[in-house]
C-alpha cells in the first residue's frame, strides 16, 4: 500500500501547481487564498492564522535557510522532491512542511471537497480500484498515523 500511496502522491504533486513562482527558483511565501475564518466552524480563524503566520512561515523560512546553506537554492521544489532522500533532514522536513501547507491552503478551501474528476480520478481508480477504496485506505492511514502528521 505504501507504494500505491507514494505513486498517487507523486501524481498529485505533478497535477497541482500551487504557484508557478513556488515551483521554480526563488521560493516565495504564498498569500492565503481566503480569509482565516473561511473554514469555520470546522477550523477556527485563530488556528488558521497560527498555521499560516507561524507554522507555515517557519517551514518556509527554515527551508530557504537550509536550501541556501546546502547550496541547492537554485533547484525547484519539484527537483528537490524528486530526490528528497538525498538531502539533509532540514531540507526534507522544512521543505515538506512548506509544500504541505501550500497544498493544504488549496485543497481545504471553503468550496473544496467531493469527488475529484479527470486525471486525478483516473489515477485514484487505477491505483485503488475505486474512490470508496481510496477513502477507506486514506482514513485508515490517518487513523494509524503516530504522533503529529498528515495522511
Spans of features found by a protein language model:
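Bacterial Sec-dependent N-terminal signal peptides
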Residues: 1-25
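Feature for soluble, non-membrane regions of globular proteins
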Residues: 22-151
Amino acid at each position: 500500500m505504501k507504494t500505491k500511496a507514494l505513486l498517487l502522491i507523486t501524481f498529485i504533486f505533478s497535477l497541482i501547481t500551487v504557484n508557478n513562482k513556488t515551483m521554480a527558483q526563488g521560493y516565495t511565501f504564498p498569500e492565503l487564498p481566503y480569509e482565516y475564518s473561511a473554514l469555520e466552524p470546522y477550523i477556527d480563524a485563530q488556528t488558521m492564522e497560527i498555521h499560516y503566520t507561524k507554522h507555515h512561515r517557519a517551514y518556509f523560512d527554515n527551508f530557504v535557510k537550509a536550501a541556501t546553506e546546502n547550496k541547492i537554492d537554485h533547484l525547484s521544489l519539484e527537483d528537490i522532491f524528486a530526490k528528497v532522500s538525498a538531502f539533509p533532514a532540514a531540507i526534507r522536513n522544512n521543505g515538506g512542511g512548506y509544500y504541505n501547507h501550500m497544498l493544504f491552503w488549496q485543497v481545504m478551501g471553503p468550496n473544496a471537497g467531493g469527488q475529484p474528476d479527470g486525471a486525478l480520478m483516473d489515477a485514484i481508480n487505477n491505483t485503488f480500484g475505486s474512490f470508496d477504496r481510496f477513502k477507506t485506505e486514506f482514513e485508515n492511514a490517518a487513523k494509524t498515523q503516530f504522533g503529529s502528521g498528515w495522511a
